[in-house]
């Protein structure tokens, strides 16, 4: 069983301009969650618990999203909004997230090779976080079907 997943998220997001000029495309919201979180949730549903991200300049928001925000939690404590962070906090608490930077943009293959230090010699899945796959209730996600 595959236990690791790599997200090559270093690209410039030019297909989504001007929305991605100052925000990574992977953080663009789909309803109430960023696009990349849907990919992580799908991989998690397939039994994957370790995630590696190959990032680039301007992608710090992805790292911040998959990290605990003590300041935000403190600010919303007692407001009734704590539940809104529940889905991301469950991912953070039950999974491992690691990040490395692709210093030169040389394409998808190079990004995956750059992630080797996160994955090692283990079998792994690759999820392209700008591909949004809709799964009907009760159906397995794309990774679980493989």
Where are these regions (language model features)?
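Conserved beta-loop-beta/alpha segment of the NTase-like Rossmann-fold superfamily
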Residues: 71-75, 82-146
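N-terminal glycine-rich phosphate-binding loop and ensuing alpha1 helix
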Residues: 1-77, 81-82, 138-145
């Amino acid at each position: 069983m595959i236990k690791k997943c790599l997200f090559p998220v270093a690209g410039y997001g030019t297909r989504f301009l001007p929305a991605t000029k100052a925000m990574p495309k992977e953080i663009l919201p789909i309803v109430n969650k960023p696009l990349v979180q849907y990919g992580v949730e799908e991989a998690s549903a397939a039994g994957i618990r370790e995630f590696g991200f190959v990032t680039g300049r301007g992608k710090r928001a992805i790292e911040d999203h998959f990290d605990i925000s003590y300041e935000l939690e403190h600010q919303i404590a007692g407001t009734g909004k704590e539940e809104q962070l529940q889905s991301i906090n469950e991912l953070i608490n039950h999974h491992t997230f690691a990040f490395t930077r692709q210093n030169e943009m040389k394409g998808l293959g190079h990004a995956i090779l750059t992630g080797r230090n996160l994955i090692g010699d283990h079998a792994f899945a690759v999820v392209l976080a700008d591909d949004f796959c809709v799964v009907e209730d009760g159906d397995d996600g794309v990774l679980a079907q493989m």
